[in-house]
Amino acid sequence: MQKKDMEIEITLLTVTAVSLFTIKLTRKAYRFALSARIGMSAMLVLTAIGHFMFTKGMAMMMPAFIPFKTELVYFTGFVEIAAAIGLQLPKLRVLTGWLLILFFILILPVNIYAAIHHVDMATATFNGDGLDYLWYRVPLQLVFIAWIYFSAIKARDPEAFDIENNPPYAYRKNI
């Protein structure tokens, strides 16, 4: 298991938990889906940063027939940042959720290719974990897909950040 994956899991879970309790304190209610989307957005920003820090290693994760590998790594980094923002915008949340699920499905073959070829994206070498890594990565990818589905698509709080129509609890008394 690569260290970067533990960092993204820790970020996802920690930011989700902190958001959950912060929202509970400010809105007097738990907003699980909103907290999960905030956690996923933080994770996406972290992984996007990885696209700019580990560009060479990420380019090595793609098969030879894919052109413009470096540009594609940068592009997908920007896509992840856009998705992080889209998850927080009520009007774009569901569309962003579906596009993220598609994105997570499309990048899985890249992770499989990288595992087959022992790519270590952080060091840009062929000293990675190999096929054993897939026993971790494939279920993790399924967790990400479920996380997005339940927090962005199936969630019932589309106006969670709409301050005008859904103000925090402390301000409702004055309206």
Spans of model-derived segments:
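Membrane-interface extramembranous regions
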Residues: M1-I175
